[in-house]
A protein has these predicted regions:
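Membrane-embedded alpha-helical bundles of multi-pass enzymes
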Residues: 1-197, 402, 409-411, 451, ...
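Soluble catalytic domains of enzymes that build or remodel membrane lipids, polysaccharides, and related
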Residues: 197-481
């Protein structure tokens, strides 16, 4: 590899990173991989050089898009750079071998390997699907309508396909085939988006659901004296929502900082608020239960949430199913119990094991907590669960996401996290109400349009009419289709591995 190749890699990584930020540069995702295609086309990389390519991609992308991790845990930022350098090296090495040994499949292999790289990040305790290219399209609501057919994986696949087509057009200027395909694909893509936005029917309901954003600073949130100030603020904001005819008020993740189901004073404090406001409240709080015999700890701790009605009447508890790797739980504790001795100031919550569905008024919703918003599959099961008794899908009226993004500070993190709600809404054609402690709180309709949104650290409530759609999306029915892409990527990678690499001249 020449020095210019490393510069191309740096340029491509920078373009892809900038496409993710709220700078109206999402279109860069359609050309950001072209420098990488130019490098792979030369097919003269050694493994050590590919490791440098992977390191440049990981360092540039993570420092531009995810620099805010370093403000919370500098070792965590270093760790994620090292881990994804390894992941990118595996992906790039597979692509390199496909280019060198299966050249007729090189473009298909390029797309399939990178799609597989994104898709596998949805599984296992290390799951961290923040590298999905589809999220670069967050500003283009018309383009994300296609997510109801194939999810974010289909959107990412199209982004990569456009990179390949534009590269071929630039490399072979006299060939019109890539240009024709680009025009045809873009026309179909925009046409479907226009049809969905204009013609897909929605039913409007005056549900009077309000989302609270109290904006309590992370450094103060868990202070004992702050607890009383927080509860007073919650009552004040909830009363304002009631004055606006609220029937349900959604508080953020961990709003009640005490163990609500075990703390009598916290229950009395919440009862006093409920007696005053006389509306349903959905809130997050920490929770613990006795550990089973033989467990290392005496209690199991959960990141929990529930619906509370005047009385108070507590609903079933929802326990967060997907935890932030290392932030909320050390990896592989069940497999390697000796890891319990490690202390990185993480919480070590337990995994929730089931979803919950709540009824407020005559409307049904299912909740997710914080990081879970990044995962399409769990939201498919929340929004459109399978009814095993009647052997058919049924659909909730809306979804709720609560989060505490205070630790993001004023970085791009809250925006990146919040925009995922647009994709989850379109994938399932369902409205999402999102309460974030310090922002960004929002209401997104089933077409991915933001109906209401807060500013960072704004103290306020927001609301919007509820729009529902009876549609059971194709994506819900076939959401495992990326497994086919993964299988194809594995197959051609294995084929390239059994062939002998040609000698270098």
């Amino acid at each position: 590899m020449r020095r210019s190749d490393y510069l191309l890699v740096f340029l491509g990584a920078l373009l892809l990173a900038l496409s993710r930020l709220p700078l109206n540069l999402g279109w860069l995702v359609f050309i950001g991989w072209i420098p990488f295609l130019m490098v792979f086309e030369r097919c003269n990389c050694r493994p050590r050089q590919l490791l440098w390519v992977a390191a440049i991609k990981a360092v540039v992308y993570i420092l531009v898009v995810m620099y805010w991790i370093g403000a919370v845990t500098p070792p965590g930022l270093i760790g994620i750079v090292l881990v994804y350098t390894g992941f990118y090296f595996i992906a790039f090495y597979a692509i390199y071998r496909i280019y060198a040994l299966l050249p007729k499949l090189r473009y298909m292999g390029f797309v399939a390997v990178l799609i597989s790289f994104e898709y596998v990040q949805n599984f296992g305790e290390t799951r961290f699907p923040w590298f999905n290219q589809a999220y670069s399209l967050a500003d283009y609501t018309i383009l994300i309508q296609l997510a109801d057919l194939g999810g974010v994986v289909l959107l990412s696949l199209l982004c990569l396909l456009f990179n390949v087509l534009i590269y071929r057009l630039l490399a072979h200027k006299r060939r019109l085939q890539p240009l024709v395909i680009i025009i045809l694909l873009l026309g179909l893509w925009l046409g479907y988006g226009h049809y969905c936005l204009r013609y897909k029917p929605l039913e409007k309901h005056e549900a009077q659901i309000h989302v609270m954003q109290p904006s309590i600073e992370q450094d103060l949130k868990w202070d004992e004296e702050q607890y009383y100030r927080s509860m007073a603020l919650f009552q004040e904001l909830t009363l304002k929502a009631v004055e606006d005819s609220a029937r349900l008020v959604i508080w953020p993740e961990g709003a009640v900082t005490r163990y609500l189901r075990h703390d009598l004073q916290a229950q009395l404090d919440l009862k006093a608020i409920l007696d005053t406001v006389k509306v349903d409240i959905f809130t997050g709080f920490p929770h613990f239960e006795p550990a089973p015999p033989g467990h290392r700890n005496q209690e199991l701790y959960y990141n929990a949430a529930t619906l509370v009605r005047p009385g108070p009447v507590f609903g079933e508890l929802y326990f967060k199913n997907i935890l932030v790797p290392m932030g909320e739980r050390t990896l592989w504790l069940d497999t390697f119990p000796f890891l319990w001795v490690l202390n990185f100031q993480q919480a070590n919550w337990e995994f929730g094991t089931k979803l919950e569905y709540f009824q407020s008024g005559n409307l049904e919703f299912s909740p997710s907590i914080c990081y879970e918003l990044a995962f399409p599959e769990i939201h498919h099961r929340m929004a459109i669960p399978w009814d095993g008794l009647q052997h058919r899908y049924r659909k909730c009226d809306y979804l709720v996401n609560i989060t505490n993004d205070a630790w993001f500070g004023t970085s791009y993190g809250p925006w990146l996290h919040a925009m995922m709600a647009k994709f989850r809404a379109v994938e399932n054609r369902i409205q999402i109400y999102r309460s974030a402690n310090t922002g960004i709180s929002l209401v997104v309709d089933p077409k991915g349009r933001i109906l209401a949104q807060t500013r960072l650290f704004e103290v306020t409530n927001i609301t919007a009419p509820l729009y529902t759609s009876p549609e059971i999306t194709l994506q819900r029915r076939i959401h495992r289709w990326p497994m086919l892409v993964l299988a194809f990527a594995l197959l051609i990678t294995l084929l390239s591995c059994v062939k002998t690499m040609p000698r270098r001249s």
